[in-house]
Regions:
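Structural preference for solvent-exposed beta-strand-turn elements
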Residues: 1-169
Length: 169
């Protein structure tokens, strides 16, 4: 069956949720307590070891194959307008996000700011911190980075919704 990356990731989430729920259910039912004199069979939870292990192994195999298919797709599919693979884009977007955050902090500074504390304590000495960069250049770089980040995210969203790959469950 053909899946887009977005569909495959939704399926992966569903499989992981089912796997976690089954593990949790197994943990709650694989052993149990009974009071002295209580009929053990009346409080025994339903649990089939062989059936549970078989389903867990089946889910593990499907999850493994699906992750591999997604990884293969991500390392070979090129993102339009960028000339890099999805895999590279998944590294590039956090880099842009980090750069944007740094530039936001830099562009928010005043050229000269009074320092209120020194070494975590109030000081009677008047001290100033000065920016050592061109604020206009930082603001320009911030706008370019924010635009590039938006463009990258939209391009990645497009390829994840449009292009598909084959995966057999």
């Amino acid at each position: 069956m053909k899946y887009t990356s977005a569909q495959a990731n939704k399926l992966l989430k569903k499989l992981n949720d089912e796997y976690s729920a089954l593990l949790h259910k197994e943990q709650r039912s694989r052993d149990f307590r009974a009071a002295m004199g209580e009929d053990i069979e009346s409080v025994r939870p339903a649990y089939d070891y062989a059936k549970t292990q078989a389903r867990l192994e089946e889910l593990e195999g499907t999850i493994r194959r699906l992750k591999h298919a997604i990884n293969c797709f991500n390392t070979t599919q090129v993102v339009d307008g960028f000339g890099i693979t999805i895999d590279e884009m998944l590294v590039y977007i956090p880099q842009l996000t980090k750069r944007k955050s740094k530039l936001l902090e830099m562009k928010s500074r005043l050229p000269k700011e009074r320092v209120e504390e020194q070494y975590g304590q109030q000081s009677n000495i008047i001290d100033y911190t000065y920016t050592n960069y061109d604020l206009a250049a930082v603001e320009e770089d911030y706008e370019k980075t924010a635009d590039e980040l938006s463009r990258a995210q939209l391009a990645l969203d497009t390829v994840n919704q449009r292009d598909s790959f084959e995966f057999c469950e």
